[in-house]
Amino acid sequence: MATPYKEERDIQKSYWMEHSSDLTVEAMMLDSKASDLDKEERPEVLSLIPPYEGKSVLELGAGIGRFTGELAQKAGEVIALDFIESAIQKNESVNGHYKNIKFMCADVTSPDLKIKDGSIDLIFSNWLLMYLSDKEVELMAERMIGWVKPGGYIFFRESCFHQSGDSKRKSNPTHYREPRFYTKVFQECQTRDASGNSFELSMVGCKCIGAYVKNKKNQNQICWIWQKVSVENDKDFQRFLDNVQYKSSGILRYERVFGEGYVSTGGFETTKEFVAKMDLKPGQKVLDVGCGIGGGDFYMAENFDVHVVGIDLSVNMISFALERAIGLKCSVEFEVADCTTKTYPDNSFDVIYSRDTILHIQDKPALFRTFFKWLKPGGKVLITDYCRSAETPSPEFAEYIKQRGYDLHDVQAYGQMLKDAGFDDVIAEDRTDQFVQVLRRELEKVEKEKEEFISDFSEEDYNDIVGGWSAKLERTASGEQKWGLFIADKK
């Protein structure tokens, strides 16, 4: 009797034998517009890979070699592996003149595939894990973390949620998963070397492929970059965000208070008011720093025909944003990224927008100088953020700031930091009165819907929200906590 493992492999092999009869880029991408897409998508994917000059690269699911030759141009050596013999033969006929490529016909899941542990600098795959069962993905993650050197990288790109290509298929055994499945499997993966040192995978990045957002309004093409690190390496802040402040249940709880799609003060109402101040024009490019679950980004893209790039350090936030994007057909791309280390070319954006996020950033002057570089001449920045009074904080307020890891400034000092970064026409408004009105309205709504809230979440969640909002109202009433609106131009 066939095992589930053998059945899965046979189904996938037969599917790819059928789609490899015509060894073209259209067949590999399963899309009639593949040639045009490939021109944008391939350079984008290659640009996202960590540096691999002179390094050893293992390409899993190499197919006809769409990426193999490009990888060989910079790598020290490339092992190009695929389980369809005709595909790897085509790859070799196209790229065989590169003497640093070893071509292998093998199934990545096969126990017969022997790759030495700790021998690879970069593992690269493009559309591979979606053709493996859940259990095979887990086993594959364990093999990959073993094969890669400490400090080395794993890059993979998958179709999530639903298919992207328009090719007709008699059957489709592809596993279109939620992105959080891959994130969880690779985050939980650990290994020990022969000396007993423990290693895990640290997420370096996770984002949608922009070419698919631009050409198909489709956010389901997602790539991940992981680095093999010692277990003791510090990932505390991202872990704090995802396991404490912004764990999945907490995000849904915040959303109930702020309104569908929103996790910052005033939800849709304040978003509509502040976005109106940015004078958005069709075709402009907006960067949303701390985009949360994407409500403001969808609003901007749908109502002003702009292209929005939303970044957030919280994996959970971006996972929700990607799920909410399904079916909206809007020009928004999302990425798990740290705004203090992320790089964009100078003059990339028309507008930079950030809502109640920069309070987490300790070196605001450096961030604002970076924003200034990223903005095009004539560009604009709009920020709302938690602030404080210019007086010395009380011990209680100082403890709150310390416990949250916030960096708070008074409204005028905050505006001055924008001026010092090079911005002109800086508006720095104390919007604390508006903040108080919004807090009261949000608190009233939660208290009114107490039974429903407790039923959907828990009594502890209800008490946390009511306690948290009441404490914010006390801190604003004492004059210690403020809320600022900042708008500035790059001339």
Curated annotation (Swiss-Prot):
N-methylethanolamine phosphate binds at residues 245-246, 254, 386, 400, 404-406, 472. Its EC number is 2.1.1.103. Keywords: Acetylation, Cytoplasm, Lipid biosynthesis, Lipid metabolism, Methyltransferase, Phospholipid biosynthesis, Phospholipid metabolism, Repeat, S-adenosyl-L-methionine, Transferase. The modification N-acetylalanine is found at residue 2. GO terms for molecular function: mRNA binding; phosphoethanolamine N-methyltransferase activity. Induction: Induced by phosphate starvation. It comes from the Eukaryota. Gene3D superfamilies: Vaccinia Virus protein VP39 (3.40.50.150). Highly expressed in roots. SUPFAM superfamilies: S-adenosyl-L-methionine-dependent methyltransferases (SSF53335). This is Phosphoethanolamine N-methyltransferase 2. It comes from Arabidopsis thaliana (Mouse-ear cress).
